[in-house]
Amino acid sequence: MEFYERVLGFQRAYLVAEREAAFYWIGGPGHSMLGLWGAGAGPQRMSLHVAFSASLEDILDAPKRLEAAGVVSRDFWGEPSKEPVVIGWMPAAAVYFTDPDSHLLEFLAMLPESARPEIGVVTWNQWRGEIERSAAL
């Protein structure tokens, strides 16, 4: 992590020490993101992935567009999914997929709601339900 912070000057967005994971903004908050995990500690057996900033509209449409191109969209845990997930600590909507060389890629859209790290990672529909319940209180 020191390399990315001190040498490259990346801004740390989030640290999950118990999972040996660190996330860095590239180009400032809300833009592209680099996620790093200790060997074998990351979801989907990854040690690195790159997240590209996208609009929420593009994120919501991505599973359908990827499927039409023969690419499987996946959830945070690597399971095939037809809807985005929401990462509560950011919060951001995300869709994961791999390129032809098996590199893990992510489309990411920051959401306007307040961060909810306590919910972890949930499906888009679960997130919308949580937001609606909170608004009703």
Set out the residue ranges of the language-model regions.
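Short, flexible turn/loop "capping" segments at secondary-structure junctions
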Residues: 42-44
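Eukaryotic phosphotyrosine signaling hubs
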Residues: 46-50
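Residue-level detector of conserved, well-ordered beta-strand and adjacent loop positions
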Residues: 25, 37, 98, 108
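Residue-level detector of high-confidence beta-strand sites
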Residues: 13-15, 76, 107
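Vicinal oxygen chelate
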Residues: 51-100, 104, 111-118, 123-137
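Short glycine-/small-residue motifs
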Residues: 33, 104-107
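Core segments of cupin and vicinal oxygen chelate
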Residues: 1-32
